[in-house]
Amino acid sequence: MIPPEIRRSVLLQKAIKLALAGTLLTFASFSATAADPSSDTETPQPPDILLGALFNDVQNAKLFPDQKTFADAIPNSDPLMILADYRMQRNQSGFDLRHFVDVNFTLPKAGEKYVPPAGQSLREHIDGLWPVLTRSTKNVKKWDSLLPLPESYVVPGGRFREIYYWDSYFTMLGLAESGHWDKVADMVANFGYEIDAWGHIPNGNRTYYLSHSQPPFFAFMVELLAQHEGDDALKEYLPQLQKEYAYWMEGVETLQPGQQNQRVVKLEDGSVLNRYWDDRDTPRPESWVEDIATAKSNPNRPATEIYRDLRSAAASGWDFSSRWMDNPQQLSTIRTTTIVPVDLNALLYQLEKTLARASAAAGDRAKASQYDALANARQKAIEMHLWNNKEGWYADYDLQNNKIRDQLTAAALFPLYVNAAAKDRAAKVAAAAQAHLLQPGGLATTSVKSGQQWDAPNGWAPLQWVAAEGLQNYGQDDVAMEVTWRFLTNVQHTYDREKKLVEKYDVSSTGTGGGGGEYPLQDGFGWTNGVTLKMLDLICPQEKPCDSVPSTRPASLSATPTKTPSAATQ
């Protein structure tokens, strides 16, 4: 007779083998066509790979209202052992999946609700939030999806418990305005660390975000830090700027006209531009059930294709928007990877210009000239391929149909923001934005009502700032004032009623948070805080700063951009 302890050991070994097989099968079924960087043994695996069938079953059981909850849960022991245990128990009578999860995982804690002191002005409220939103994760538990960072950082707030790439730049604008240059330096250091560790800045510091980046604002961050530290900041982060550029341009050397590789595109005339791309083609762990349902709703397309386009939209920061869809009412028609975004290419133009400046600061004039030439080539490609001459605004290019898209979105302001627009075209964009996107509460993201959060009637703080500063770059101060004043009034009215700043706003009126999307409205909120402080400086004179939005609209903006216009604006 076999002793019970040996029998249990044999059974456990069999279960582990089954668990391993199941994990590999799960990986194969979801990732067969993916060029997955997380397959590298040095790269931590996301929870859907670590936990295989268990992850799929928990998410499909909808144990938690937010799918991000289990994606952020920490296994209490080796995931393979947990998975083996699960395979042994799951078919037993009375098995309780929620109890199993509670025993084997540490779930993320709900953040304590911040109650601000009574009677605070808008500025006082924001200044009081910085320590509330600051986190430190120098050390994380084994198997945690959270990735460690060497310095403290400011999170957006709400369900967003980690650092996010493009959010952080607008948060950093506010930190700098508040005099927290130490926090700005810490966050730039964290992003530099991520570039060194992973070859790029992921969407956020989670394992499940490693397969894509976000709008590339690292150059802006370094330029911001250089305002305080001078050219030393440019020289210090030149290697990381170069690595990020290499990530976005990977594969360009071998491309023939009409070909694409990951994030880079070569058009038929040889112009080189970029697109958003995710290295995986699986459901997103933080939105697992939603992505599976989206793919099932369009059986005429391969599910893996839809998954990659959903992930690539997350990389764009605009998740989700009619901008990426053939049918704005049907998310499964999303095709992000066949669209060349105007805002992404404007940001990469800025990266090239910053690389030129940093190379010059480091004494490498030859490299500086090379990067300037690349920036000039991109600027010409933007003017050639991302300008809709019929409509009179900048737009995205459609690779599938080989033509410029007609839709006007707030992304049209990005060439103005980076000083890459021709002067006459900037004036046309200003007129179009005023006529089609400007609403009582700020600038709408698009004019389409799709139910997605990056569409009408929502307006987002970063896009308000891009618009206001871009319009000022070209002397469109009246429209810039309208965007600034209307959005600030919206923020102030919402704060007066609810005592909080939120992630997005309904700009069809004032005093209402935005809706739509995959999750409830979040408060905090990092980038809204930063943009609000900067906009308060725009409408109030330096000698008499304001702590809240004035009741009377100022006659003109008080501050002007400090950027040096590029040759395109001369």
Curated annotation (Swiss-Prot):
GO terms for cellular component: periplasmic space. Residues 544-570 are annotated as: Disordered. It is found in: Periplasm. Residues 1-34 form the signal peptide. Residues 554-570 have a biased composition (Low complexity). Provides the cells with the ability to utilize trehalose at high osmolarity by splitting it into glucose molecules that can subsequently be taken up by the phosphotransferase-mediated uptake system. This is Periplasmic trehalase. It comes from Salmonella paratyphi C (strain RKS4594). The gene is treA.
